[in-house]
């Protein structure tokens, strides 16, 4: 009793010595918490974040364990000889759906097609500057692997190379890439045909071209300042999907290349051939000649 009174001088201790000690400890803890409150809050926030992360990981692991357990509980599947056939059938059905989507997407473009009993027959239409040109078809058989049954693509178009790169993995990419080749070829051929038919009086020799129309050479004449000048041109189309040349060489027989007037004409003609369709270049030459004649008359 004396011990208790010593710990509680002047008043009675409620609950005994242990209770009094607990109260003192609680008061001390409160005081400490007040002094450490900012650090504690920061630590608590960090712990809450960590707890959330751990709970997310726990939930994820629980889901994986549950999924794995369901698989383990499943009875072993019996060998089904038709399983492979069904799987292949599903793949083919998916290919059919892809083809339908392609036909719908290309309804208003240069590509169109119709479904056949074996697959789809695609029609690839070409055009240049609003002029409809030749059309080609590719008959595809929808099976694994996809294959080309018939086609009307010219032999100099690398159809097999394009098919090997894209047909089995991306049919749309295959068709678009093939269209690029065919459309560029048709555009180059159209320009050469226009030059021969509409500007034959300007050509001083035959237009030479290869089957792909990616190499053209010709000689032509241009009237300037009451004089007629002859030029030779060589146009190379290194990009098979381009309708304009990548390399142009213009020469003039018997004239020094270093001559300033000649160099100016050469550079001007080369720039025109690189940036404009062939027949439009010669149309501009004709307009310049007409202007010159009008100026002389007036």
Swiss-Prot record:
Subcellular localization, as worded in the UniProt entry: Nucleus; Chromosome, Centromere; Chromosome, Centromere, Kinetochore
Top-level taxon of the source organism: Eukaryota
Protein name (record): Centromere protein O
Any coiled-coil regions, as ranges: 39-74
Subunit text: Component of the CENPA-CAD complex, composed of CENPI, CENPK, CENPL, CENPO, CENPP, CENPQ, CENPR and CENPS. The CENPA-CAD complex interacts with the CENPA-NAC complex, at least composed of CENPA, CENPC, CENPH, CENPM, CENPN, CENPT and CENPU.
UniProt KW keywords: Centromere, Chromosome, Coiled coil, Kinetochore, Nucleus, Phosphoprotein
A GO CC term attached to the entry: nucleus
Family assignment from sequence similarity: Belongs to the CENP-O/MCM21 family.
Renumbered residue ranges of the record's region Disordered: 29-49
Modified residues (Phosphoserine): 35
């Amino acid at each position: 009793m004396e011990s208790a009174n010593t710990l509680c001088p002047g008043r009675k201790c409620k609950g005994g010595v242990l209770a009094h000690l607990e109260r003192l400890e609680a008061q001390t803890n409160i005081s400490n918490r007040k002094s450490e409150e900012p650090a504690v809050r920061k630590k608590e926030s960090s712990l809450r974040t960590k707890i959330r992360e751990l709970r997310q990981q726990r939930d994820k692991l629980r889901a994986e364990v549950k999924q794995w357990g369901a698989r383990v509980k499943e009875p072993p599947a019996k060998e089904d000889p038709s399983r492979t056939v069904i799987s292949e059938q599903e793949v083919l059905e998916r290919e059919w759906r892809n083809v339908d989507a392609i036909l719908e997407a290309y309804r208003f473009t240069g590509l169109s097609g119709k479904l056949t009993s074996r697959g789809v027959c695609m029609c690839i239409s070409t055009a240049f500057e609003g002029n409809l040109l030749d059309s080609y078809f590719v008959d595809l058989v929808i099976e694994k692997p996809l294959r080309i049954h018939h086609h009307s693509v010219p032999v100099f178009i690398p159809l097999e190379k394009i098919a090997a790169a894209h047909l089995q993995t991306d049919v749309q990419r295959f068709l678009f890439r093939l269209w690029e080749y065919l459309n560029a070829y048709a555009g180059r051929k159209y320009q050469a045909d226009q030059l021969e038919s509409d500007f034959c009086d300007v050509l001083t020799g035959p237009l030479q071209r290869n089957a792909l129309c990616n190499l053209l050479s010709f000689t032509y004449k241009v009237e300037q300042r009451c004089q007629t000048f002859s030029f030779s041109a060589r146009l190379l189309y290194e990009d098979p999907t381009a309708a304009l040349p990548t390399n142009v060489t213009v020469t003039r027989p018997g004239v020094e290349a270093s001559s300033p007037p000649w160099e100016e004409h050469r550079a001007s003609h080369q720039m025109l051939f690189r940036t404009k369709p062939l027949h439009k270049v010669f149309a501009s030459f004709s307009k310049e000649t007409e202007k010159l004649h009008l100026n002389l008359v007036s």
